[in-house]
Amino acid sequence: MKSGRYIGVMSGTSLDGVDVVLAAIDEHMVAQQASLSWPMPPEIKKAILDICQGQPLTLSQLGRLDHQLGCLFADAVNALMEQQKLKPEDVMAIGCHGQTVWHEPTGSAPHTMQIGDNNQIVARTGVSVVGDFRRRDMALGGQGAPLVPAFHQALLAHPTERRMVLNIGGIANLSLLFPGQPVKGFDTGPGNMLMDAWIWRQKGKPFDKDGEWAASGNVVQPLLQKMLRDPYFSTPAPKSTGREYFNYGWIERQLSSFAGLPAQDVQATLLELTASTIARDVQLSGGAERLMICGGGGRNPRLVARLAALLPGTEVSSTDEMGIRGDDMEALAFAWLAYRTLSGKPGNLPSVTGAREASVIGAVFPANPLNNRSLPTFPAPPGR
């Protein structure tokens, strides 16, 4: 097993910055040692939003953005390494998810695209990188997402308590950790994404701090019911989605027959949509004794309060209470997935993604001279 220090890098669907964590990882332990959040320049955020909403761009523009994101991720890693006085040889590898700009897991040619050139990260940090985590799972018939439930299982499963982990980023996803049962997980639908898109267009703010704007409005029930009829919400798991589906254009289509609504009422309705779709999926999945929240949505007290109200038989808490800072969860997960890759261990869960089999996932971009460490030797497939 490739035990040692790993760095995880995550730039999620909320586009609120780059999260970077440092952790010591071995077969039995994931010990977070440091973290930081690195700002995302507004022009890069805008370019990503444009792609995700289907605006055309040239291959040159895509290549430039891929380069810029790789440099941005490297800057974030170098800042953490400088803060912790680390040399490249002190770090086994960087696990970098990349920035998802398109995710289309169904149809005749399922595909997903994460950008942020891993070669730039290697060249600028001197540390080997593991990236491109999702496409192996898709090649095996899976959704390529979510991948974090495997990490939730390793850290947060309980021998007797029915638990769920809820990550509320741009998209919300659930991990079902039930004793004696295979782990399940799926995207419930929008997390912060639609609320962020609406307040950005209406007020020029990146997010609704503490849900205060939503709290000033009233839920428009006919609009909420129209939103809930979107076919994604009735699609059975395994399922996954992203900004290419739930975006500002989606809001505009829902509002087409609701002209003149107060903007704060739309925001209140979007918050209720997130809360109600999550709560419904918790209940349809059999319920949980404890729902542990991570991600940026966990800092929205209005949203958390609505979830608690909709789930009266469930203890709603934060992963912070379990010793894992919610804002760092996904970056920490990709540090762990990098460890799994270099150790030749599967990183996906077929019970979550629908893949035909568990597999080593991710591509390795080695540093030169490999950080004075050898790359993993993967076990031969059965029967070979």
From Swiss-Prot:
List residues binding ATP. Answer: 12-19
Q: What class of enzyme is it?
A: transferase
Q: Which Pfam families match?
A: AnmK
Q: GO biological process: what's one of them?
A: peptidoglycan turnover
Name the chemical reaction catalysed here: 1,6-anhydro-N-acetyl-beta-muramate + ATP + H2O = N-acetyl-D-muramate 6-phosphate + ADP + H(+)
Pathway in which this enzyme or protein is active: Amino-sugar metabolism; 1,6-anhydro-N-acetylmuramate degradation; Cell wall biogenesis; peptidoglycan recycling
Family annotation (InterPro entries): Anhydro_N_Ac-Mur_kinase, ATPase_NBD
* Keywords, comma-separated and alphabetical: ATP-binding, Carbohydrate metabolism, Kinase, Nucleotide-binding, Transferase
For this protein, the Enzyme Commission number is 2.7.1.170
Entry's Gene Ontology molecular function annotations: ATP binding; kinase activity; phosphotransferase activity, alcohol group as acceptor
Answer whether the UniProt record assigns the keyword Zinc-finger to this protein. Answer: no
Fetch the PANTHER family from UniProt: ANHYDRO-N-ACETYLMURAMIC ACID KINASE
Provide the family line.
Belongs to the anhydro-N-acetylmuramic acid kinase family.
Matching entries from HAMAP family are given as: AnhMurNAc_kinase
The function of this protein is:
Catalyzes the specific phosphorylation of 1,6-anhydro-N-acetylmuramic acid (anhMurNAc) with the simultaneous cleavage of the 1,6-anhydro ring, generating MurNAc-6-P. Is required for the utilization of anhMurNAc either imported from the medium or derived from its own cell wall murein, and thus plays a role in cell wall recycling.
Q: What is this protein identified as?
A: Anhydro-N-acetylmuramic acid kinase
| Name of encoding gene | anmK
